[in-house]
């Protein structure tokens, strides 16, 4: 077991390091487009929240106090839920007999996460994008799931949640993939511009670097290309001598990693810019599907094929995760006036440190909770990936029709001007995580439209953004504290109470109180 853990740890480290490096260098050429040229057009909810924390800390006074109070409220609220189970983390229409009957008989159920952090995220995203995202959830949960539940055999034994995983989520995957391809086509000019700059610098021609203002100065394209080539060379060695052992299959695997990571980097950045959520699991699932099909076509299947596909998917997944997170860092830097080149350089060190530690974390989680068996970590995305790979590698059914439906829907949405990526994210992410975004968006709309004085409305909206940022920061911080306590063996969770109807009703009441607190506190704002 120890040798196996060490072997897996080495694989995790290399996947994380190579994927992280690719994510950084493939995003840098697109920094200016997402951060500068699209300034004011994307909400960047996570970047906004973090920037509010930094700015309020710099200003001090009332803003810092307000942020600290909001962080304490949001953090304490989420902490007592995750650590003690004081009330349920989410409520659903099953809370009453009629709702339970609708869920069991008609497969219609509505869920709502009651967390403070998600409420704050919805406030920052705003009503427009929150509504589009939740519309995708409504289509799946209120049309697709009940419709499928009415025609499948033995429907009584299948829950709406299972129908969502089996039918709704694949439609979302198809939509995300097509929305990503549409985004790639639309951003072809940006891609060509980045490639043109690379060719120009590689040829030794002078660029306008000397006249570029400090806050727009990136690492040189020559250095970026050097890192790309070095990373691909290291991946070549890793695939050949650590995974595949066949040069033809190794070259194919390397091509898959580079092409998909390069193309979907812009999709990951776009998703983070809009909703603050990276659809990396959906894009990784598409990577696994494509890589599995290609690997099977060149004679690699079975367990060795699944292992190869997972390694390829792991590298791409890490690259897209890094790209999505890094665009947030760069946007924050743009707002506070940092030098992008310095951020980019230090990110390489951060990637190396993360790669060295993530393997240990994975091994500890496996030894503490396990990934299979009773009481194991749920790992829903990992289970979905396994379900995708197995039929492709070992023979079975793949939901191509559902992928196709999602892709066609994304094209239709694009043609009528609806952001297909946001809508598809709604189909992929569970309803209970999307519905609170609308609640937060409604709070933002309400507080910013009550006065006839535009200055008052702006002051209220800004104050609410600070409170929402506090909710997000406090919830995230206390979530880490709660996880550390659980890992240390502290078992303070009242499971029997947390699963009761009383806890669910209390959760609904506490959520309403949190919304009321946020709206009341925000409405107190006055223009400076």
Annotate each language-model stretch with its function.
Residues 52, 56-69, 208-214, 337-349:
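Membrane-interface alpha-helices at helix entry/exit sites of multi-pass transporters
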Residues 187-192, 450-454, 518-528:
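Membrane-interface capping segments at transmembrane-helix boundaries
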Residues 16-28, 69-85, 117-123, 136-146, ...:
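Hydrophobic core segments of alpha-helical transmembrane domains in multi-pass membrane transport
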Residues 37-56, 92-104, 192-214, 374-386:
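Juxtamembrane inter-helical linkers in multi-pass membrane proteins
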Residues 1-12:
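Single conserved hydrophobic/aromatic residue that forms the stacking wall/gate
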Residues 41-46, 127-131, 135, 273-287, ...:
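Short, non-helical or kinked segments that cap or interrupt transmembrane helices
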Residues 14-17, 102-110, 246-260, 306-319, ...:
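Structural signature of hydrophobic alpha-helical transmembrane segments
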Residues 233-328, 334-335, 364, 376-379, ...:
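Membrane-embedded translocation segments of transport machinery
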